[in-house]
């Protein structure tokens, strides 16, 4: 029972983060599940099963509020679904003990990318004439992001969100809505790949329902939270958290000398704290709390 409550909290925390940033539900929840000793394939399968429900709810909400660029969604869902299915089949064939440290390394690198992006490259997009993706851009982007999402348990948001933010004409809210809406197809495709490769018997449905419950509870809270807190600060906090969780797995797997473990954790914590303080100095204490009006004014 205690583990189910913990998994529900993991789902809640992950959805709060994803609903605020448009990324990191899969990365956060998979990282925490791996920390509990769950094999990479089962962890990723559980997360994607839960995401079928959470991404559907998120997508409907974004469509309702006009936060979706439908053309971009159509361009990404087919190549993304193919990549997710192939990634799920690939991960399912790897032995859990062999794959775990490498998946943690991949997630740690994604966490580092999220942290660096929000630390140094955060620039709210301005509304300009929309320049859509062409096939040479959308197909490789969808396949790579879908494959990364299935193999790492997360990656659709961290890969697609910064690419779309760099495009002209898509405001941050539309980027988040487009990524979240298209992720439903990715979750369905990855789930199909896992169920075909792993079978139903390896899935713990109580874990899945716990993750779903936490995510459903967090969805409206996240919608409120994204209007209140500065996204740059949230991004740095999330990136550092992902690094710390996955660093624990890598340290335990690859560094036998336990005497140096506290030193490594201290160094990671110090760097993370420095990054948070740096962001606070950039945005100013008065700008930590953002209102919906402030955000929408920047987008227009």
From Swiss-Prot:
Chain coiled-coil ranges: none
InterPro entries cross-referenced by the UniProt entry: TM_pro_TauE-like, TSUP/Inactive_protease-like
Alphabetical UniProt keywords: Cell membrane, Membrane, Transmembrane, Transmembrane helix, Transport
Subcellular locations according to the entry: Cell membrane
Membrane topology: Multi-pass membrane protein
Transmembrane segments: 4-24, 33-53, 76-96, 102-122, 139-159, 206-226, 231-251, 260-280
One GO CC annotation: plasma membrane
Protein family (similarity comment): Belongs to the 4-toluene sulfonate uptake permease (TSUP) (TC 2.A.102) family.
PANTHER family assigned to the protein according to its UniProt record, in alphabetical order: MEMBRANE TRANSPORTER PROTEIN MJ0441-RELATED, MEMBRANE TRANSPORTER PROTEIN YTNM-RELATED
Name the record gives this protein: Probable membrane transporter protein YtnM
Gene label: ytnM
């Amino acid at each position: 029972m205690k583990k189910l409550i913990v998994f529900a909290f993991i789902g809640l925390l992950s959805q709060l983060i994803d609903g605020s940033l448009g990324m990191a539900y899969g990365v956060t929840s998979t990282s925490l599940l791996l920390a509990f000793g769950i094999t990479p394939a089962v962890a990723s399968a559980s997360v994607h099963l839960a995401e079928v429900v959470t991404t559907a709810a998120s997508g409907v909400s974004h469509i309702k509020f006009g936060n979706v660029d439908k053309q971009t969604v159509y361009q990404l869902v087919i190549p993304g679904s193919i990549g997710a299915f192939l990634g799920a089949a690939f991960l399912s064939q790897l032995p859990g003990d062999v794959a775990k440290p490498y998946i943690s390394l991949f997630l740690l690198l994604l966490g580092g990318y999220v942290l660096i992006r929000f630390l140094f490259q955060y620039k709210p997009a301005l509304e300009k004439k929309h320049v859509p993706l062409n096939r040479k851009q959308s197909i490789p982007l969808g396949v790579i992001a879908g494959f990364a999402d299935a193999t790492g348990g997360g990656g659709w948001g961290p890969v697609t969100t910064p690419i779309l933010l760099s495009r002209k004409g898509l405001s941050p809210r539309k980027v988040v809505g487009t990524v979240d809406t298209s992720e439903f197809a990715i979750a369905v495709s990855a789930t199909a790949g896992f169920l075909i490769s792993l079978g139903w018997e390896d899935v713990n449905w109580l874990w899945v329902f716990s993750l779903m419950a936490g995510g459903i509870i967090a969805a409206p809270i996240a919608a409120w939270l994204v209007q209140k807190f500065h996204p740059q600060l949230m991004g740095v906090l999330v990136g550092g958290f992902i690094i710390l969780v996955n660093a624990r797995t890598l340290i335990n797997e690859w560094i036998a000398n336990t005497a140096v473990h506290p030193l490594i954790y201290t160094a990671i914590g110090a760097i993370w704290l420095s990054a948070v303080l740096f962001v606070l100095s950039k945005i100013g204490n008065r700008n930590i709390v953002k209102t919906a009006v402030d955000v929408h004014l920047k987008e227009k």
